[in-house]
């Protein structure tokens, strides 16, 4: 996922850090996880809703924190093949509607997907609003199937399995 020139401050600051690391001339590997699945574990679920500033049909690639840790361990174990690379990772991808349906099945009660108007988010936090606007317009573009095939050692969690693990 290219994070340069997105207009999203917290993406662009990460890009600057990555460029600085590359310019230091030291060995490095950069792991670029997508949106964290754990971001969905908010108080809204207790109120039977999943609310995000994305349309219900927008596909959002997501990473489980467990998978980020497992992939990081793999990078540390193998070392050399990963040096000098940036690897973007994602565990799964679902729409808001799909996520709400899966969460409903796991929790045993109806979770309604609510699309928060982006204007409301802009009023509260422009940086976050820009990020969600970008997610709405630009897919992160990770080839999840190829990633998982290339690194089968990672116990990649589909959203449904992640939800069962976290919510039961």
Where are these regions (language model features)?
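Conserved residues in the N-terminal Rossmann fold of short-chain dehydrogenase/reductase
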Residues: 115
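Oxidoreductase cofactor-interface core, primarily capturing Rossmann-like NAD(P)-dependent enzymes
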Residues: 2-112, 121-128
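A hydrophobic C-terminal alpha-helical subdomain
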Residues: 118-168
């Amino acid at each position: 996922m290219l994070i340069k020139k997105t207009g999203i401050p917290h993406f662009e600051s990460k890009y600057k850090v990555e460029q600085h690391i590359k310019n230091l001339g030291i060995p490095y590997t950069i792991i670029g996880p997508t949106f964290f699945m754990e971001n969905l574990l908010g108080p809204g679920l207790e109120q039977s809703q999943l609310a995000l500033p994305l349309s219900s049909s927008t596909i959002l690639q997501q990473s489980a924190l467990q998978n980020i840790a497992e992939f990081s361990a793999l990078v540390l174990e193998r070392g050399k093949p990963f040096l000098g690379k940036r690897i973007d990772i994602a565990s799964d991808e679902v729409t808001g509607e799909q996520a709400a349906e899966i969460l409903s099945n796991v929790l045993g009660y109806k979770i309604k997907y609510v699309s928060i108007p982006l204007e409301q988010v802009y009023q509260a936090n422009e940086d976050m609003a820009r990020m969600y606007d970008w997610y709405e317009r630009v897919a992160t573009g990770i080839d999840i199937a190829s990633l998982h095939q290339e690194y089968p050692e990672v116990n990649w969690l589909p959203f449904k399995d992640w939800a069962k693990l976290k919510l039961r």
